[in-house]
Every structure is written in C-alpha cells, then in structure tokens.
Amino acid sequence: MATTVEGAREVAEAAEQARVASIVFCTLRFAPETAAWIAEHGATGGWFTAHAEWIGALWAPGAESEFGASPWRREKGGLWDVGPHALSVLIPVLGDVTALTAARGPAGTHHLVLNHASGASSTVTLTLAAPLAAAGVDIQLRGEHGIVGLPRWEGAVGAFGAAVDALIASVRTGEAHPCDVRFGLRLTELLADAEAQAGA
C-alpha cells in the first residue's frame, strides 16, 4: 500500500474520511486454498510457534521471472515485496505483532522474530536474491495440534477475483474486510520498523 508509515496512514485516513470500502491485495488471504487454511487454523488456536520462509531468486543466473526487471523490487527487496504476504498469513492465525526484532543476512535477506498477541512467537526469512536452487515458500505452524504447513495455491488470478468479490461484498454490507487499508497500514508499520532495525 505504501513504503512509509506516513504514506500508508494518509491512504487509510482518506479511505476512512470518504467512507469507502477497501481491500489490500495480499494474495494468500484471497487464494481459495490458503484463505481456507488461514481461517481454519486461526479458529483452531493453540499455536506455539510458526516459521515463514519466502525465498526468491529473481536475479540468480538462469532465473526467468518477469518480476526480475522491476526497479522497485531491486530497491526495496524481499522485505517490502514478499514480507506483506508472509505477515498476512501469520497475523490472522497468531494475532497482532506485539514485539519485533529484525536483522539482515546475506544478499538482502531479512530475518524477523515476532511476538504475537496470542502468546505465540514466529520467525520470518525474506529475500529475492537467493541462489536459484534455494528458492521456495514455506510456512509452518507448530502447536497443540501438531505441525501444519501452508498448502500450495493456484497463482494470483483466482485470488484477485476473490479480492474483487470481497470488495464488492464490503461495499454492499458496509462491513470492513479484515484485509483492508487499516491492515495495510499495520503491515507498513511493521515493515518500516523492521527496515529501521536492520538498516536499509
């Protein structure tokens, strides 16, 4: 939504003042497979810890991604590109982040350690600049019910359609969606905090 807290807050306040519905497109919140998983395990509770790895290899030799030419991704890296997606899974399951520690690793990698309102903790590893053979996405929860992993999802097209449907429903009902501009503002606050701690 924005890469500064001030910018995100301006958007959120404008939406509130105009009384308009909003959606922030965090893919995994709307892809049918992952949205159902988030809802199920958020309702289950009893989670002790979680780990999210979002490891991209956009600029590795042999990589063939249309996103590799993006100047914005080169400048802001995995923290801002894929960080919102990882957090958009962890927060609805484990609760809001109450404390965050961040550190940098090799090739623009960011490591986050999070405490959540539920009492659980989680760790997150984010990069777009890993070797090609190291790339992948994995999110696991561990708790009273065992170990569960995020299912695979079928791209962004279906998720985008679901996000549009959610926006229309929010307009019709007047009920705010949990992944709206206020959630986008919260994500921006967390990512800006992580960036400041780890160093640009």
Q: Model-derived features: where do they sit?
A:
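Structured beta->alpha junctions
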Residues: 26-29, 104, 130, 183
